[in-house]
């Protein structure tokens, strides 16, 4: 059995590091410091070019985040939806292999059928992951929301089990996995649960074994060392630009890969 390792990246260098480290799939974003926003077409094209230049070409899927702004409400206006639908169309035209999206109703916290349905329709046959918007929903509506996600046509749910980290939400993820199994038995719709947030080589094995999931998501990042002596200034109210830059580490990805692959060997 092969366990899927997805690495989220927001720079070209991080994408290359993830690929070289053994990632099975990339979640491509911009601004991971903001939780991940829609990436640029230029970044996607550069990564796809890197993959195509190998002999034979590497076939690592690149799923693009569709999220036009920061914020944990995941409730969007009609105009914001139009922005994201345009972005999706452009990214699909330039080689995106799948998309990552989530939207909730502002009044109920329920999965937004209309907005998610628009994205599913625009994606066509390309697969979709419902992102950690699911972690901002009410636990009492978890079964209902997972059924809606499956009904819409999403193939994967990225989750930390409604907690800040997947390790903290491990019991809820196991519950979600059981719900997904029941959904498939009743409807025939397969919904893969993929734990993410705070995943490392130290806890990946525990999370997979305790939840029964066959996929895991992480950033495998380290603080980038820099000899740059340029004076730093805040470029916004949050002062994020003054913080150290985090990038994907090939060594960290390899550690994660070895950790989850050890399950198969046991």
For each predicted feature, which ranges?
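Short helix-terminating capping/connector loops at secondary-structure junctions
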Residues: 1-2, 55-59, 185-190
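Glycine-enriched alpha-helix->loop->beta-strand junction motifs that scaffold or abut catalytic
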Residues: 19-26, 51-52, 95-98, 122-126, ...
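Glycine-rich phosphate-binding active-site loops on the catalytic face of alpha/beta enzymes
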Residues: 24-37, 90, 94-108, 152-167, ...
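C-terminal alpha-helical cap/extension of soluble enzyme domains
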Residues: 69-70, 74, 95, 183, ...
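N-terminal pre-domain/capping segments
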Residues: 1-26, 31-38
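Active-site-adjacent beta->alpha loops and helix N-cap segments on the catalytic face
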Residues: 12-16, 32-53, 60, 78-81, ...
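Catalytic cores of alpha/beta
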Residues: 10-21, 71-90, 135-152, 173-177, ...
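Hydrophobic faces of well-ordered beta-strands that scaffold small-molecule active sites
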Residues: 3-9, 26-28, 62-66, 99-101, ...
């Amino acid at each position: 059995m092969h366990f899927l390792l997805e690495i989220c990246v927001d720079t070209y260098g991080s994408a290359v590091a993830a690929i070289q480290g053994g990632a099975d799939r990339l979640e491509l974003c911009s601004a991971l410091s903001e939780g991940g926003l829609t990436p640029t077409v230029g970044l996607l094209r550069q990564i796809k070019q890197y993959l195509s230049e190998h002999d034979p070409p590497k076939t690592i899927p690149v799923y693009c985040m569709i999220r036009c702004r920061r914020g944990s409400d995941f409730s969007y206006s009609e105009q914001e939806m139009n922005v994201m639908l345009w972005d999706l169309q452009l990214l699909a035209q330039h080689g995106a292999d799948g998309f990552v999206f989530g939207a909730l109703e502002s009044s109920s916290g329920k999965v937004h059928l209309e907005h998610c349905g628009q994205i599913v329709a625009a994606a066509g046959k390309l697969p979709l992951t419902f992102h950690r918007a699911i972690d901002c929903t009410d636990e009492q509506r978890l079964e209902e929301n997972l059924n809606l996600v499956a009904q819409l046509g999403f193939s994967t749910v990225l989750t930390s089990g409604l907690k800040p980290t997947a390790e903290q939400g491990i019991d809820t993820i196991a519950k979600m996995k059981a719900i997904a199994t029941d959904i498939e038995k009743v409807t025939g719709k397969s919904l893969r649960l993929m734990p993410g947030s705070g995943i490392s080589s130290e806890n990946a094995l525990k999370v997979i074994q305790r939840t029964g999931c066959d996929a895991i998501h992480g950033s495998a990042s380290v603080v980038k060392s820099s000899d740059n002596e340029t004076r730093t200034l805040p470029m916004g109210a949050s002062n994020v630009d003054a913080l150290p830059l985090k990038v994907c580490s090939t060594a960290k990805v390899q550690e994660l890969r070895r950790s989850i692959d050890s399950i198969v060997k046991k």
